[in-house]
Curated annotation (Swiss-Prot):
This is Elongation factor-like GTPase 1. The lineage of its organism: Eukaryota, Metazoa, Chordata, Craniata, Vertebrata. It comes from Mus musculus (Mouse). SMART domains: EFG_C. Keywords: Acetylation, Elongation factor, GTP-binding, Hydrolase, Nucleotide-binding, Protein biosynthesis, Ribosome biogenesis. Residues 429-496 are annotated as: Disordered. Residues 438-452, 474-484 have a biased composition (Basic and acidic residues). GTPase involved in the biogenesis of the 60S ribosomal subunit and translational activation of ribosomes. Together with SBDS, triggers the GTP-dependent release of EIF6 from 60S pre-ribosomes in the cytoplasm, thereby activating ribosomes for translation competence by allowing 80S ribosome assembly and facilitating EIF6 recycling to the nucleus, where it is required for 60S rRNA processing and nuclear export. Belongs to the TRAFAC class translation factor GTPase superfamily. Classic translation factor GTPase family. InterPro entries: EFG_II, EFG_III/V, EFG_V-like, EFL1, P-loop_NTPase, Ribosomal_Su5_D2-typ_SF, Ribsml_uS5_D2-typ_fold_subgr, Small_GTP-bd. It catalyses: GTP + H2O = GDP + phosphate + H(+).
Amino acid sequence: MVLSGVDKMIRLQKNTANIRNICVLAHVDHGKTTLADCLISSNGIISSRLAGKLRYMDSREDEQVRGITMKSSAISLHYAEGHEEYLINLIDSPGHVDFSSEVSTAVRICDGCIIVVDAVEGVCPQTQAVLRQAWLENIRPVLVINKIDRLIVELKFTPQEAYSHLKNILEQINALTGTLFTSKVLEERAERETESQAKPHSEQGEQVYDWSAGLEDVDDSQLYFSPEQGNVVFTSAIDGWGFGIEHFARIYSQKIGIKKEVLLKTLWGDYYINMKAKKIMKVDQAKGKKPLFVQLILENIWSLYDAVLKKDKEKIDKIVTSLGLKIGAREARHSDPKVQINAICSQWLPISHAVLAMVCHKLPSPLDMTSERVEKLLCTGSQTFESLPPETQALKAAFMKCGSEDTAPVIIFVSKMFAVDVKALPQNKPRPLTQEEMAQRRERARQRHAEKLAAAQGQTSQGPTQDGGALETSPHEDEPRGDEPDVASVSRQPVSQEESSQEAFIAFARVFSGIARRGKKIFVLGPKYSPVDFLQRVPLGFSAPLEDLPPVPHMACCTLENLYLLMGRELEDLEEVPPGNVLGIGGLQDFVLKSATLCSLPSCPPFIPLNFEATPIVRVAVEPKHPSEMPQLVKGMKLLNQADPCVQVLIQETGEHVLVTAGEVHLQRCLDDLRERFAKIHISVSEPIIPFRETITKPPKVDMVNEEIGRQQKVAVIHQTKEEQSKIPEGIHVDSDGLITIPTPNKLATLSVRAIPLPEEVTRILEENSDLIRSMELLTSSLNEGRNTQAIHQKTQEKIWEFKGKLEKHLTGRKWRNTVDQIWSFGPRKCGPNILVSRSEDFQNSVWSGPAGRESKEASRFRDFGNSIVSGFQLATLSGPMCEEPLMGVCFVLEKWELNKCAEQGASDKQHQGQCDLAGEGQGGGKTCHVGDENQEQQDVCSEPFEETSQKGDSPVIDCYGPFSGQLIATMKEACRYALQVKPQRLMAAMYTCDIMATSDVLGRVYAVLSKREGRVLQEEMKEGTDMFIIKAVLPVAESFGFADEIRKRTSGLASPQLVFSHWEVIPSDPFWVPTTEEEYLHFGEKADSENQARKYMNAVRKRKGLYVEEKIVEHAEKQRTLSKNK
């Protein structure tokens, strides 16, 4: 660095009011990294000629090759304006949807953001996503409309057309901002209404309903983007220029003689200037007057581009002279017009000044953090700020004050961990020597040289040695000795090969309060840590070293070993970091997995989890090429899991090591990192493991050729159903409505189960509230264990009743009567989109009885048996009968549950759950039971005999089939599976929402690729003023691999898709369908050789899992020969 040294950055870090923590957000290829290059070049870190070409913040090789940013990188910049100096902590973030998790890690530690929008493409899908992320994190945005040069060079717009186009873009992004604002106001209003309804009405009087939405009472004047407010800048980052209207208002106020304040309000908008009267008036479109923005700003820029592109040297010289610029001879003679434009515009309208001035004036400092954001960061789950302990609420003042006193609590948030090579750390780099150190080295070299000469003269007087060995010196002799205090000697020690190949993990963090000092001990709080638990375990006023504190779950103590200043590709050592700054922390790899909260006070709660837009959905199994390298693979996958905020690493029940990523590009990057950085071995990667879900539907009304199912076909379907039911083992009864009645192996209990498809809306509600359902389960277990959850119980209970009300709203009708109150469990994993309903008269239990009510005596009595029933339901929903995939949208109704008295007595007596004792055979009068024939060794596998006998006077009822709870689990699982098989089964495919931008020339090819891959177009919209189309479609995840490459090849790179996981969709075709009608035989053939999509997916999953696959084989192979015989 030339202009901004580390010492200056350390000095600027102490002035919190002049710190700006910002990130650059945009759709892919809208110019984020090019803009960052321009801002970095203003500090002299890179040459201004390389800005936009070097991509300084893209330090990975694959980032440079692909031309897209894949990770968030931070750099500290210095900006001076007058007597004020500012420190800009700039974070460049990715625009590709696969890496949207990196955007989440960036916006959490920022106070503001720059939204970059392409002037040609306008507001794109990922622009909406990043703006929504910024809104959710309560950070203030400013707008940069980039690539204005494309309007001139590519689209050939006139200044008037360009002005209209820019107005449309501004209206689009303001409409999006208004939508976010409106939804927030309406949510707050709904919360207030819920609270008011919960309060009892003291007076019974006439109630008046307020029909207003509450939008009129909220000030949104500072919310929207508007050039006159100074939060919009127009730029061309590749050409190095940019401006806000404040720059031209200052110039023209002196030339025209109109006040700067007036020009600020009228330079953007439909205003024109009357030069005779020197007044600014409204534009009358009929008279063809030009707006001020066109007349005073755009026409000047257009004329400059026109002169340079036409190589009008006389006009160029005139413009340069009038602007008072100095252009070098090399740039003036250059044949590339871009070089000349960059040389002129970067001096006339420097982009760095326009953008950084807007950042300093319009974006907040760490001192301006709103109380709303502080409360949102501290309140996890369903908590409210008022429900937190008083010690925790007191931390709000520390956030707002951003104090740097010694008594201020140190609060740091780690948003992600990133890996760097050990050799790239500052302590392992050779540092330049100071003048004093160089003088000391010269003096020591002279002394050594004099000693060698003296020794050589002494040896010469005694006699020369062979080969002149006395005069030879070791090549390392001039190096400083180990005991000499030389700074460079430490860093120049050879690094072992093992150490040089290691990766060090640095925490990407921000200090919210207090001063982070090297060597300070601090608490690391996990996401499940609760300050309430700590305050209950540790007595008030406890003062001792942190190591002596009693163990508290999800809390550890660590030392801040190394602090770093993040400078893009470089790291600089720091001794301390004041509050409000972004920093890197070394030595936390053993304490932090992905993100964490660091605090000097244990009363601080962990920050709310990061909000990820993209859901990991793409799975692959990995294994080493050589089995002996499995330990390296396991270690590498652990490092990869820590280095990537979005990736998930799983070990399945089969022993497979599975990577779960957000998309195809993200998958490729993770595999490259695994091979080259973390595991450093050759690995084998399976085909993508496509997730599916199994469900049931109502019986279809039309057949496969879209004809209504008639009587004959209904008979055929019934016959087919009976054939399927005939495969069900004996002893299981199936009635006409699909009710399965199945006894346990010991005949002590009988279960009657029915499967019903849930409405789509109910399934969606269950998916959206999975976190709340999980909280209900945790609360129920907490209450059963006697733990205190009163602090959050009331707020959670309100959400539970709201969730219950939504279910009651959509589960209406005769067959769903009282269903919500009878919900016993959710599944799989007790928080999935399937429900278990208990309609048994003898046994009734409800999921609402735990968190929202009291458990009945009968439910408490049969709790052990009930847990077995629920466990069987969980197993059944975890793997369905078609291809062992989880179920979705299925309601299992337990119609009857009959228990014999023997089983009831067994439940009441715990001794009856033990195994039978062979030694008691003589005393029990034949009450023991043995399994196996006489030749086999008798095994003690039976339960203790029950004392009661049957009414018929038979021998005592003996359980020979293992523990009764295990029999209930297996029986319930089988009952659910059989209940599914007697209903029309369907597969559900994971679906991507696909946003494709393409020109009109290649629109047909895009549609062809989509239809080939089972895609479905939902919407097609043309961007106004361009020939670009935005196509919104849905595409199965199973068909998405290679989709981006194929569509780019077919369209010659003119179409670029963005894939985001959206929802699950039922595949309409029946995977077990066979032709039954004459029309179906004609259309599909006798054997239905053209197998349907669902069967293809089902068989692929079954093959992968090693399950039986029913495939067609050639019946008469010799009849396939078509070669004619020679006679």
